[in-house]
A protein has these predicted regions:
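Short, small-residue-biased leader/transition segments that mark boundaries at the very start
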Residues: 2-3
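Substrate-recognition/cap regions that form aromatic- and gly/pro-loop-enriched pockets
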Residues: 12-168
């Protein structure tokens, strides 16, 4: 179906843009250079890829990625419990932290997708190293998270459809 295909294509490009945006400052500062070099090069080439090829690659990657669901379920549970359930937090804090975790997850998955496109494998070690790297890159104080969200999005609280869109 044409609309589903367009949504899937748009999601791939949006996920890639989010990944590039999250890594911009690190690249500029020369941080994590060796870890990011190859995937950033691939990320910049995504826009030029044939969409049919990209969709097929994403489908194949998701087949491999699904084997790691339990690991990611545990990771996301730990992130939500530690970042969203704050003693003095309010509903907006909860939502913003949940969105930040979604960005973190999207960046991890996009990094792994780009790496998988280059190397054809998805190993526990690569997943572990990627989670560690992205968590370091996104481990900011609350003030910075709010500032980033405000700068990158119209509002710090997204439409729920956008959250679902980037997580596809």
């Amino acid at each position: 179906d044409v609309y589903k295909r367009q949504d899937q294509e748009s999601a791939i490009f949006e996920q890639n843009e989010l990944f590039l945006d999250l890594t911009t400052n690190y690249e500029r500062e020369g941080l994590y250079k060796s870890e990011l070099k190859d995937v950033l090069n691939k990320a910049r080439l995504i826009e030029e890829e044939n969409s049919t090829f990209l969709l097929e690659q994403k489908r194949k990657f998701n087949d491999h990625f699904s084997k790691w669901q339990e690991l990611f379920r545990s990771f996301l549970t730990a992130e939500i419990e530690s970042d969203c359930l704050l003693p003095d937090g309010n509903l907006q804090d909860f939502i913003v932290h949940l969105e930040w975790i979604a960005l973190e997850y999207t960046a991890i998955k996009q990094f792994l997708f780009l790496d998988w496109m280059q190397n054809g494998s998805l190993t526990y070690e690569k997943i572990r190293d990627t989670i560690t790297l992205v968590c370091r890159m996104t481990g900011y104080e609350e003030d910075y998270i709010y500032e980033y969200m405000q700068d990158c999005f119209d509002d710090v609280v997204w439409e729920w459809g956008y959250l679902a869109f980037i997580l596809t």
